[in-house]
Regions:
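DPxDG-like acidic metal-binding loop motif
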Residues: 79-90, 94-115
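Generic structural "secondary-structure junction" signal
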Residues: 57-59, 69-71, 76, 110, ...
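Gly/Ser/Thr-rich helix-start
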Residues: 59-61, 76, 92, 213-214, ...
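An extended, acidic
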Residues: 139-289, 293-298
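N-terminal subdomain of lithium-sensitive/metallo-dependent phosphomonoesterases centered on the IMPase/IPPase/PAP
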Residues: 1-85, 147, 151, 178, ...
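Short basic, glycine-rich beta-strand/loop surfaces that mediate nucleic-acid
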Residues: 74-75, 104-107, 204-208
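Conserved phosphate-binding loops in N-terminal lobes of ATP-dependent enzymes
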Residues: 1-33, 104-146
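Short capping/connector residues at structural and topological boundaries
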Residues: 73, 99, 127-132, 197, ...
């Protein structure tokens, strides 16, 4: 079952309102205020939509308001049932410090079609479109995955570019990539934006190879599904996190999730820029109005577009 195309613009409006709210805190050195600035207007907009939405990927537990928390019901509670994966402000640090790649993001699918990932780490490899299905595997060596990718893309290994989150936990991956001659492009934060540099007509990277957030992995999968890209992820769970994962219906703690297991059906993805970034330009304050730019995808409609809108102050 596909999602009615009318919902795309409604969800775009929600991320636009979130981005405008967050933009008022750009460079103000206050991550928490910036996050709240996005959450409140986004929640208000989502609650206007005729749907019964449930947050399956959110920012925290119920007692951590003002977050959009896991299990929260959104919408008028009349209409289709949707799973919602949301990060009202991806890049709170980027916003507070006036750095690139902060945005407001949401992914929507029919109820039961999004993986409910706990807020834990997830190993991830992501690649773009037009490649053999299930090409790469987290249990392969880095060298084997890169060799397979180079062959599939008909490129020399030395011409491949890998995006890696700059963390000491990735030292072994970086060492292996460097030894075989892959160019490494580091990101300091911003797991979603980093992983999505593998898509587009002229992608900045050929592969994303990092351990980042589990919830972010599902949001990335939503966008990649619309593009025909691929991701494989595996949750990294300690004992407490295993208990939380069980409550979300996860039984196999070592399971490798491919894209079709993270996003099962139709999906909408919207990301509105707060600061300028790879996905969209940031909010522009034009004096009497705000100019906002959104990167929007709808899988069943094959929609891939960038939309610019204006809001009076």
């Amino acid at each position: 079952m596909s999602i009615d195309s009318k919902y795309l613009n409604l969800f775009i409006k929600a991320t636009e309102k979130g981005a405008i709210g967050a933009s008022k805190f750009i460079g103000k050195q206050d991550k928490i205020a910036a996050d709240k600035g996005a959450v409140d207007p986004m929640r208000k907009e989502l609650n206007k939509i005729n749907m019964e939405g449930t947050v399956v990927i959110g920012e925290g537990e119920m007692d951590e308001a003002p977050m959009l928390y896991i299990g929260e019901k959104l919408g008028t509670l009349k209409g289709p049932k949707f799973d919602i994966a949301v990060d009202p402000l991806e890049g709170t640090k980027f916003t507070a410090n006036n750095q690139p790649n902060a945005f407001s993001v949401i992914a929507i699918a029919k109820q039961g079609d999004l993986l409910s990932a706990p807020d834990t780490y997830m190993e991830k490899i992501a690649i773009g479109a037009n490649l053999p299905k299930n090409l790469l595997d987290l249990d392969n060596s880095v060298k084997k995955n890169i060799t397979l990718l180079a062959a599939a893309k008909k490129k020399n290994i030395s011409d491949l570019k890998a995006c890696v989150l700059k963390r000491t936990r990735h030292d072994d991956i970086v060492k292996e990539l460097t030894e075989i001659g892959v160019q490494i492009n580091y990101i300091t934060d911003g797991d979603i934006a980093g992983a999505l540099t593998v898509i587009g007509n002229n992608p900045k990277n050929d592969i994303y190879y990092s351990t980042g957030g589990g919830p972010e992995g599902v949001i990335v999968a939503a966008a990649l599904a619309c593009y025909g890209g691929q991701i494989q992820g595996r949750l990294i769970l300690d004992d407490d996190e295993k208990m939380r994962a069980k409550k979300l219906g996860i039984k196999d703690f070592n399971k490798k999730y491919n894209i079709d297991e993270m996003v099962k059906g139709d999906v909408i993805f919207c990301a509105t820029g707060v600061t300028d970034g790879d996905l969209a330009k940031g909010v522009e304050d034009l004096g009497n109005e705000y100019k906002v730019t959104t990167f929007a995808l709808h899988r069943s409609q094959k929609t891939i577009k960038t939309i610019v809108n204006f809001y009076n102050k």
